[in-house]
């Protein structure tokens, strides 16, 4: 397990998609996270950055797609995503001006 000191090094960016935007109503948020981070580190980082109580964390490793270029093939970067569920009664996270 790699030790990462700053919580902002663990949480890299929110995922902006239709699916993640619709899950906000259920207090479920999706983030792109550091590939070496684990669920406990993600939970602690979310609680420190946004001052909320996290109920559960699910993670998914997404393989980068293979893409064709003029000279052959390249590959997009692989990412790790964290689907974070907030505890009931926790205040919502205002990521992109979503309705609460």
From Swiss-Prot:
Keywords carried by this UniProt record: Ribonucleoprotein, Ribosomal protein, RNA-binding, rRNA-binding
Keyword Ribonucleoprotein: yes
Domain of life from the UniProt record: Bacteria
Biological processes, Gene Ontology terms: translation
Coiled-coil ranges from the UniProt annotation: none
GO molecular function: rRNA binding; structural constituent of ribosome
Assigned GO CC terms: ribonucleoprotein complex; ribosome
Biological role: One of the early assembly proteins it binds 23S rRNA. One of the proteins that surrounds the polypeptide exit tunnel on the outside of the ribosome. Forms the main docking site for trigger factor binding to the ribosome.
Family in the record: Belongs to the universal ribosomal protein uL23 family.
Subunit structure: Part of the 50S ribosomal subunit. Contacts protein L29, and trigger factor when it is bound to the ribosome.
Protein name per the record: Large ribosomal subunit protein uL23
Organism annotation: Mycobacteroides abscessus (strain ATCC 19977 / DSM 44196 / CCUG 20993 / CIP 104536 / JCM 13569 / NCTC 13031 / TMC 1543 / L948)
Primary gene name: rplW
